[in-house]
């Protein structure tokens, strides 16, 4: 029963309230901060549970009043109050169920986004640039900071590959649903016959990983330095500031040339490498989970075709939830929350289903 779990959480919260006020625990700052975070996480659930108990008590009190009331006008007023309280109680039950869902420990983290032009040549590279702009605009709307890590540009303004970081609270919780294959259908500027072409770009969204989460031994990496290049491969730097890091055990390769400093490029490349190794470890972990326990909303497979952008129809369709919006222009300007929120809702519904007994 959910009520048993809520009572346990409430007792745990009360215990933590005492602990974080204990001077002996406060002396150990690391332990104290850990307990404070746990206390803050539980506080949201406890406060919602208090609201639920108050609504339940009010509802029962009104039902008792109704059974004793004979005046018709008063009965109508009480019935109206009962109706409102019943609806409020149901809303609180739904909110509590969502709060009790297992938390993704990466949700509050910054993210690395990798976009690669897939099938379609120059047109795919141009679409990759469109996606880069879309995510940049979305980050701006959320007041998140965008930091370019590396880019392999084409002569006509597209990207064979672009890797960038988005820093901001909750960035991963929203953008993790963007991992997968994105398909575009449109008439290229170079197409004289007006024929619609289909191209793809793949997106990978990786949470930023702390040094302590993924440890990389120096003996496991090979570092090469080279001169940074710009559009078409021309040299834009006279020093060997660009860095390529190869992780020997996994074969993963990361390059960074955005900074003028070799040291900064190395730091950035190591961050991306850590994120990729973490993603690899997570994929292996999830592969060991029974299929029926996995969320039905894709949040990680780069090969999964997740969305189609149809320019002639002004349409964007997310295939995971069969949702279509006829607002492609605004979507590409970063107005992507309508689909992201729908994906989050579907993900929550699947997780609640996996939880089994959700009776109060």
Swiss-Prot record:
Lineage: Bacteria, Bacillati, Bacillota, Clostridia, Eubacteriales
Function: Peptide chain release factor 1 directs the termination of translation in response to the peptide chain termination codons UAG and UAA.
Membership in a protein family: Belongs to the prokaryotic/mitochondrial release factor family.
A GO CC annotation given for this chain: cytoplasm
Segments passing through the bilayer: none
Main location per the UniProt record: cytoplasm
SUPFAM superfamilies referenced in this protein's UniProt entry, alphabetically: Release factor (SSF75620)
UniProt cross-references to SMART domains, sorted A to Z: PCRF
UniProt subcellular location: Cytoplasm
UniProt PTM: Methylated by PrmC. Methylation increases the termination efficiency of RF1.
One GO MF term: translation release factor activity, codon specific
Modified residues (N5-methylglutamine): 234
Record keywords: Cytoplasm, Methylation, Protein biosynthesis
Name assigned to this protein: Peptide chain release factor 1
